[in-house]
């Protein structure tokens, strides 16, 4: 994320992107799924407790918003994470259930999402003339998971090997 931000900063500072265009543009942000998933990977490095880890992630998001705001961004959408603890790869993690979602992981996701929502709610105070939008993805995904046939016929996949 920092590399992309640096590239964007360079374009703005070199006037390769007009600031008025930046002010009219929409900025969509969704990040954090891999961070939460990776928190549960085995490691010899000590980890902070889950709350501290999520708070550090939220500081990174706020830093990102600070920086794009300074470059002229005024329309910013932050999207929540979906239920990371329900991805099939979670079954590969030590101690994770393979027949249901990984609750500990989704607790972190929900805390992170609440922090994002709070950031958007207070955006107008910290960032004058900015418009913040929160995209609540988690609940939408959970509705699809709970009742998939309500939204669409189930898909069937055929895999062919050659």
Where are these regions (language model features)?
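A short acidic, glycine-rich active-site loop
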Residues: 49-56, 100-109
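Alpha-helical scaffold segments in carbohydrate-active enzymes
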Residues: 7, 60-63, 67, 115, ...
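Structural recognition of the beta-strand scaffold that forms the well-ordered cores
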Residues: 25-30, 38, 75-80, 133-136
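Conserved beta-strand elements of beta-rich interaction domains across eukaryotes
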Residues: 32-36, 63-64, 71, 83-84, ...
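Conserved SGNH/GDSL esterase-like catalytic core that processes O-acyl groups on lipids
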Residues: 1-59, 63
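A structural motif corresponding to the C-terminal end of an alpha-helix
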Residues: 63-75, 112-132
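Mobile gating loops/cap/lid regions near enzyme active sites that modulate substrate access
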Residues: 83-103, 118, 122-125, 129-162
